[in-house]
């Protein structure tokens, strides 16, 4: 690996340990020429997930889009950035575990809604109203009734 300071091509690994819950390896390296120490991360390159949209268009899965939707739904709610990030991680992990390279956008939305329903009901309703594109108040009220019915069962 090339030294970021002197650009010499010879470095040695000083320390190596798992990082990111075992999903990557953190390595401390030292340049053999100038002695500069730096950190690198080694991670498995995963094949891209392709999202098949409702109109049939295909695009690469973007964690940032899921995160933005969650942030918007959770505005002014007692939901932390860590909780939002955990939902993004869980959704991506579940999608990858399916084993298909193409995933329907509906499945992503449903997974996010299921996670939000157990975390914060107001955020769930906000997300559902955008995701399901409620056309009028009656559809919105039906969704609220369903949510209240589910809560009675708990």
Curated annotation (Swiss-Prot):
Q: Which cofactor does it need?
A: Zn(2+)
Protein family (similarity comment): Belongs to the NrdR family.
Q: Which GO terms describe its molecular function?
A: ATP binding; DNA binding; zinc ion binding
Renumbered zinc finger spans (unnamed)? 3-34
Q: What superkingdom heads the lineage?
A: Bacteria
Q: What NCBIfam families has UniProt attached to this entry?
A: transcriptional regulator NrdR (TIGR00244)
Q: What name appears for this protein in its UniProt entry?
A: Transcriptional repressor NrdR
- Keyword hit for Chaperone: no
Its GO biological process terms?
negative regulation of DNA-templated transcription
Q: What residue stretches are annotated with the ATP-cone domain?
A: 49-139
State a single Pfam family of this protein.
ATP-cone
Keyword terms, alphabetized:
ATP-binding, DNA-binding, Metal-binding, Nucleotide-binding, Repressor, Transcription, Transcription regulation, Zinc, Zinc-finger
What InterPro entries does the annotation carry?
A: ATP-cone_dom, NrdR-like_N, RNR_NrdR-like
Q: Cofactor note, please?
A: Binds 1 zinc ion.
The role this protein plays is: Negatively regulates transcription of bacterial ribonucleotide reductase nrd genes and operons by binding to NrdR-boxes.
